[in-house]
């Protein structure tokens, strides 16, 4: 623990020393260069390619209309006529009550067995 504290103090001292050294001995930052004058010669752009997939020239030919699809044999709602099974939901109250009763009976039987074994092991 002492080593960690010592290292922390050394690191802080080194950081403080570097910060003070760089601020007192550093040269001032140079001023940014001025923007160059617009002395560029105008170079014409190359002509647009005519035999490439993508070109500068717009292709204004209208796209042909798609043909109407043939109607399906089962009708518009045919995919939804079958009943969807429901896997998530509440169990009927009677089944739920029977389930809890069976669990309670099993716990009671286990408790009675353990009590019976405890009584048999004791001597009066």
Curated annotation (Swiss-Prot):
Keywords, alphabetical: Secreted, Signal
Signal sequence range: 1-19
An annotated GO cellular component: extracellular space
Major place of residence: secreted
VM domain boundaries: 42-81
UniProt GO BP: vitelline membrane formation involved in chorion-containing eggshell formation
Annotated function: Major early eggshell protein.
Similarity section: Belongs to the vitelline membrane family.
Protein known as: Vitelline membrane protein Vm32E
Taxon lineage: Eukaryota, Metazoa, Ecdysozoa, Arthropoda, Hexapoda
